[in-house]
A protein has these predicted regions:
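Extracytoplasmic/luminal low-complexity segments enriched in Pro/Gly and acidic/polar residues
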Residues: 131-174
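Solvent-exposed helix-coil-helix hairpins and adjacent flexible coil/strand "hinge" segments
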Residues: 109-140, 165
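Periplasmic/extracytosolic POTRA-like scaffold domains at the N-termini of outer-membrane
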Residues: 1-22, 64-90, 132, 150
Length: 174
């Protein structure tokens, strides 16, 4: 709006306008005599990219942020319905730690609308885990992965671990 001078400024309105910015968690605006406004902003801190276009905080809050605000930060890719954000983030933390201990790097974790889990490794291999408890399926993957022989000139696209025992994999031309 228009400039209203020091006394004419509505600090509540300024605060509300600042809080409409998607990455602003909260704002405090105060008048400081004789002619200043004090503005304090609290921003959401992204820990992962959510559904390719948004971000998620460590407590599972989904929010928007211009990609250029990330600078050089490399974040994992997580995905799923917004109400599942905290569950996916917790799964990411567990899977990332478990795999790191086994010298495997996870790039992303997602759950679909039906509750089926999927993990993407840093080499772009997708692990299809299906619904339910994914932990034993990932344990099985860690056991069989070193034994998989990929045909010459091919690369693994995905490994399907939805079976009760064993797995299937799909290899495409590299």
């Amino acid at each position: 709006g228009s400039l209203k001078g020091f006394w004419g400024q509505d600090v509540k309105q300024i605060q509300e306008q600042l809080e409409t910015i998607p990455w602003v968690k909260g704002a405090v605006v105060r008048k400081i005599w004789p002619n200043r406004l004090s503005i304090w902003l609290s921003e959401y801190q992204p820990v992962a990219i959510w559904n390719k276009t948004e971000f998620v905080t460590k407590d599972g809050t989904v929010f928007q942020l211009p990609m250029d605000k990330l600078k050089e930060k490399v974040l994992p890719y997580l995905g799923g319905p917004d109400y599942q954000s905290l569950k996916v983030l917790e799964a990411w933390n567990q899977i990332f730690a478990d795999f790191k201990a086994k010298n495997l790097v996870v790039k992303g974790v997602a759950i679909d609308d039906r509750g089926a889990w999927q993990v993407t490794l840093d080499n772009d291999i997708v692990l299809k885990l299906g619904r339910g408890d994914w932990k034993p399926k990932l344990d099985r993957f860690v056991t069989i992965y070193p034994q998989i022989e990929v045909p010459e000139g091919k690369r693994i696209d995905y490994i399907d671990l939805r079976y009760a025992a064993g797995a299937a994999f799909w290899a495409e031309t590299a």
